[in-house]
A protein has these predicted regions:
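Terminal, non-globular segments
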Residues: 1-223
Length: 223
């Protein structure tokens, strides 16, 4: 198995690069673990699950097992994890209620759009919409409360910015996943759109890494 895995990574070096990119926020998060609040710990869990998903996905590819269901499952993981990140970050009960409602509605709708053999455009699109909606709601909350001294030293500013960039950048790709990410589409088309998705993910990783790094300033960054 190890030999097959090495050959797989040698053939598809881009896949290995993405897994290394995923490790960057994980490593920085672990380094600054003592500074992480509950929200950032959920983000660390999120990246850990991404790494596990990608590793299992590559193992499945080696043995020619359909791995699309992993990404569909992860759509639910993203909805719940992103929701928990922001639920823990706000104290306003009304905002918490809206976040909980968004999580519940998104997860509920996603169950009707499940597919185990192909990318579910419905689940992945809903996950993007949920991420953008909650991030924008959080931005609106911190702007209205005016409790943060320096926004650039606030971890969730960077996380939210990266999340919005990723979700906005992949929204139409996932919306038309049955066309551009289908097994029946030409490989060049699939590869192009998958690479765009990967670039958006790399940007999110970089923004999140900055978010983990500035956690050391966060406690003294409130009025």
């Amino acid at each position: 198995m190890l030999e097959k895995l090495i050959n797989h990574y040698s053939t598809y070096s881009g896949i290995l690069a993405i897994e290394f990119v995923t490790l960057i926020p994980i490593i920085i998060g672990v380094v600054y673990l003592k500074h992480l609040n509950a929200s950032m710990k959920f983000l660390l869990i999120y990246y850990t699950t991404v790494f596990i998903r990608d590793f299992i996905s590559n193992l499945s590819a080696i043995y020619k097992i359909n791995n699309h269901f992993l990404y569909n499952i992860f759509g639910f993981v993203e909805i719940v994890t992103v929701g928990l990140i922001y639920y823990q970050a706000v104290q306003n009960l009304k905002i918490r209620k809206w976040i909980a409602i968004l999580i519940a509605i998104s997860a509920f709708l996603g169950t009707f759009l499940w597919s185990s053999t192909e990318f579910s455009s419905g689940i992945l699109t809903i996950a993007d919409l949920c991420s953008m909606g909650i991030s924008i709601l959080y931005f609106n909350t911190i702007i209205s409360e005016l409790k943060i001294i320096n926004i650039l030293k606030h971890p969730l500013f960077w996380v939210s910015s990266g999340l919005i960039i990723q979700a906005a950048g992949t929204f139409f790709i996932f919306l038309f996943a049955k066309v551009v990410l289908s097994e029946n589409v030409e490989y060049s088309i699939f590869y192009f759109y998958w690479q765009v998705r990967q670039v958006m993910y790399i940007l999110f990783c970089l923004f999140s890494t900055i978010g983990f790094w500035v956690t050391k300033y966060d406690k003294e960054n409130y009025v």
